[in-house]
């Protein structure tokens, strides 16, 4: 890297950390140490989407960069994160180095991104996971603000995050589930009535989820898609179940919003929410709740949701959440700064008026009049096919490095920011007591029918242990 190229690099930490896009891979020098993650931390696309990189990959990057900055062997060198000029790689690389500043250095999103303001060419905005044209632009700043809010509400704690367990449960063969608001909302793919789906691919049944949900204090399941299993299979195992169906790929009608709020505000335990793929309808309703109860801005929530569960919130649902932001903030303000878990009749009426007002203002572009038929099934198929291809978000080299240095995931504490509370994440840390569920990773070609047996790395896997 020439002095001219260094002059064009973005200085993140004065005289120490830099970011730059280069046409060719540079060699280390006496003064500079270079590294790239373009071929190491990989986004797994559904269709034309390419980022942002997931929470687990964000965490791994932060650990990687932190180690380099603390490495005595390069303590006198400039650390330079370089990427190629591919627009997708540039966006993901810039997101990561900014995320490091938010997560590890404690900077606000605006301060972290400030060195990149005015960069040319501008960064490519992230898009949704639909097949068609995407008019909504999810920016790097949206994602950084999402991280900032997630940390503020203690939904993510860098010091106690269990990355191995997070990556385990987000795999299709291990349940396809992610915490969006840890301890309050878990998003997951719709359970199957049988242990294999129509294509013969291994699938999770209600009975597979039950022991995991019980261990994680998930006491209620909300189904948003058409019936594909008997809800009694959850109820008989002591987990409540509610149906709130609305059209695939659509935005929720007013009555669904009101029912969802009433149910969730009266449920002290954690809630598992799913549609077909657990991405669009699921993320949209959780987003409305987050705006109302946590004043989580819509654009930031979309960024956060996609970091937690890639592919979430699609098509018209994106702009819909933005249009609902003011109304949800107002609805939350009616309930007070610290929302009470039970809605009085007058508060329910006030919320209904807010939602109705928006519905009249927006006309036919929102609500349940739009349906993307088969969207959920397409998304599920994309994930299944990636699993069959053996796609992994870590490169082979990094997989070997992680396996050599990995320690077995352990149960511990996790932030109470959403443990049945609606106080914006304030509270003490709660220690999990109880037995972990041993869970064997699912072999796509060999179905494991019961949650028993040791995991690959010898540690017990716990949904509740992901965040500490």
Region locations from a protein language model:
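PTP/DSP superfamily signal
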Residues: 1-22, 28, 36, 48, ...
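Acidic/glycine-enriched edge-of-secondary-structure segments
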Residues: 25, 35-59, 186-198, 245
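Short, solvent-exposed polar/charged micro-motifs at secondary-structure junctions
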Residues: 27-30, 253
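Surface-exposed beta-strand-to-loop junctions
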Residues: 35-44, 75-77, 236-240
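A composition-driven signal for long, intrinsically disordered, charge-rich low-complexity tracts
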Residues: 38-40, 64, 224
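Fold-level signal for large, globular catalytic cores of enzyme and receptor domains
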Residues: 174-183, 188-195, 200-247, 251-273, ...
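Conserved G/P- and acidic residue-centered "switch" motifs that form tight phosphate/ATP-binding loops
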Residues: 278
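Conserved SAM/SAH-binding loop-helix junction
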Residues: 281
């Amino acid at each position: 890297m020439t002095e001219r190229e260094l002059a064009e690099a973005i200085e993140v930490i004065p005289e120490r950390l830099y970011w730059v896009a280069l046409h060719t891979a540079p060699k280390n020098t006496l003064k500079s140490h270079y590294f790239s993650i373009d071929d190491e931390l990989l986004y797994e696309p559904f269709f034309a989407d390419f980022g942002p990189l997931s929470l687990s990959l964000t965490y791994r990057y932060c650990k990687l960069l932190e180690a380099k900055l603390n490495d005595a062997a390069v303590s006198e060198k400039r650390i330079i994160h370089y990427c190629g000029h591919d627009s997708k790689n540039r966006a993901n690389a810039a997101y990561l180095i900014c995320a490091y500043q938010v997560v590890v250095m404690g900077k606000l999103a605006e301060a972290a991104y400030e060195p990149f303001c005015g960069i040319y060419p501008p960064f490519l905005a992230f898009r949704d996971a639909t097949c068609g044209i995407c008019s909504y632009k999810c920016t790097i700043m949206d994602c950084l603000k999402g991280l900032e809010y997630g940390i503020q509400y203690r939904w993510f704690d860098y010091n106690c995050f269990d990355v191995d367990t997070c990556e385990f449960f987000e795999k299709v063969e291990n349940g396809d589930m992610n915490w969006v608001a840890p301890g309050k909302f878990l998003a997951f793919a719709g359970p199957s009535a049988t242990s294999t789906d129509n294509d013969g691919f291994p699938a999770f049944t209600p009975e597979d989820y039950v022991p995991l949900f019980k261990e994680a204090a998930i006491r209620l399941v909300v189904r948003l898609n058409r019936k594909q299993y008997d809800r009694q299979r959850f109820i008989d195992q002591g987990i409540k179940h509610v149906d709130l169906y609305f059209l695939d790929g659509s935005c929720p009608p007013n009555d669904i919003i009101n029912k969802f709020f009433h149910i969730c505000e009266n449920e002290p335990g954690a809630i598992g929410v799913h549609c077909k793929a657990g991405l669009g309808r699921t993320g949209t309703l959780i987003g409305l709740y987050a705006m109302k109860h946590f004043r989580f801005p819509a654009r930031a929530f979309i960024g956060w949701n996609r970091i937690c569960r890639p592919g979430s919130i699609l098509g018209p649902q994106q702009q819909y959440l933005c249009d609902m932001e003011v109304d949800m903030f107002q609805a939350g303000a009616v309930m007070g700064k610290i929302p009470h878990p039970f809605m009085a009749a007058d508060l329910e009426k006030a919320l209904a008026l807010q939602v109705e007002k928006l519905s009249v203002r927006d006309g036919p572009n929102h609500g349940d009049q739009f349906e993307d038929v088969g969207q959920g099934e397409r998304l599920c198929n994309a994930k299944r096919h990636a699993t069959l291809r053996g796609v992994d978000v870590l490169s082979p080299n990094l997989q070997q490095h992680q396996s050599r240095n990995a320690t077995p995931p352990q149960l511990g504490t996790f932030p109470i920011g959403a443990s049945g509370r609606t106080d914006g994440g304030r509270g003490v840390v709660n220690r999990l007591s109880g037995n972990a569920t041993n869970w064997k990773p699912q072999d796509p070609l060999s179905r494991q029918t019961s949650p028993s047996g040791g995991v690959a790395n010898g540690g017990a896997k716990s949904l509740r242990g992901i965040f500490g």
